[in-house]
């Protein structure tokens, strides 16, 4: 029987929690599907997450805050290709209750790597039309909605076939019903803290980024 840490408030010893958490957390999704937001949520819930924008955050603040508000572009400019995944993967191996994020277009055979260790994957799912609009606004290029739809469906099937423990988090629900969605994530990753703080991270006005709403 699964122990629900956050909702039922079962008393669980620190030793038992540590034993149960012998897994790594991976946030998986397409660019502009909510992976950065979910990474921050997992961090707030207590997971030692690696953020891809940490090293250049000050630089991004200076260059882009005026145009994009609080949004921070990733380490590759506006399009994250995820070239540092292996480095991040190796870094979290020996770090307790840790994780990092992956971007679907460059995930390749990484599910096979993830299967080598106990893992929990949170797959972000967003309407491909919204992803297309957001990508076109931020990356200044054309995006193929049919490709995005196929990429999402294919990755979900791959996860189902892999046997990896995963959940799908819908971006729309995360933004519009953040309390319920974050508690589901919290239970999935066996978090016992930071729930209210994680919910407070979600701002429906900020986490939308439809093409016509981007300031120019």
Regions found by a protein language model. Give the residues of each.
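PAPS-dependent sulfotransferase catalytic domain
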Residues: 99-195
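PAPS-dependent sulfotransferase catalytic core
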Residues: 1-94, 201-216
């Amino acid at each position: 029987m699964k122990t629900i840490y956050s909702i039922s408030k079962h008393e669980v010893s620190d030793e038992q929690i540590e034993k149960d958490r012998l897994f790594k957390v991976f946030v998986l999704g397409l660019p502009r599907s909510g992976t950065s937001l979910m990474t921050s949520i997992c961090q707030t819930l207590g997971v030692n997450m690696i953020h891809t924008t940490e090293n250049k955050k000050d630089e991004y603040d200076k260059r882009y805050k005026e145009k994009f508000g609080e949004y921070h572009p990733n380490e590759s400019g506006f399009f994250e290709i995820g070239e540092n995944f292996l480095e991040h993967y190796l870094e979290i191996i020996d770090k307790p209750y840790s994780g990092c994020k992956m971007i679907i277009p460059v995930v390749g055979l990484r599910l096979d790597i993830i299967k080598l260790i106990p893992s929990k994957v949170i797959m972000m799912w967003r309407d491909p039309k919204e992803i297309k609009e957001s990508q076109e606004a931020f990356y200044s290029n054309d995006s193929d909605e049919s490709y995005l739809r196929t990429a999402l469906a294919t990755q979900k099937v791959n996860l189902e076939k892999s046997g990896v423990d995963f959940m799908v988090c819908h971006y729309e629900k995360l933004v519009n019903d953040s309390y319920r969605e974050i508690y589901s994530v919290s239970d999935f990753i066996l978090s016992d803290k930071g729930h209210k703080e994680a919910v407070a991270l979600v701002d429906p006005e900020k986490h939308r980024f439809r093409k016509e709403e981007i300031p120019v």
